[in-house]
Amino acid sequence: ALVIGSDIVTNAEQAAHVNGMLAHADETDDSHAPSLSHPGCAVVPAAMAMGEREKASGTQLLRAVALGYDLCARINLSLHPYDFRQAGHSTHSFGPSFGAAAAASLLAGLDYKGMRHALSYTAQQCS
């Protein structure tokens, strides 16, 4: 997968990570105020990298991004984000991690069990 703004091609995981860092680098990333999150800098790079790897169509990519944004917001909202943040946890990375995992899992064609495992792994990484 391509690292945006360069001619570097690497695996999907590394491209998603680098592109996510680039998306957040200038602090102009999107915000979802009710969930205290920035979904785009995690969801979009993960979806683009996996979409490139899997040769996804534009429709498939948009569907995955929409799923990622939705899950990101719902996860954070379910945790009562202001209380979650007050307890010392990062709302900016928690929900977006789940959104990125869901988007990438959808594009990878994982079945229900595979997606469940991917989200379980995400929960372990966020804890």
Question: Which sequence ranges carry the predicted segments?
Answer:
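N-terminal core-entry segment
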Residues: 1-127
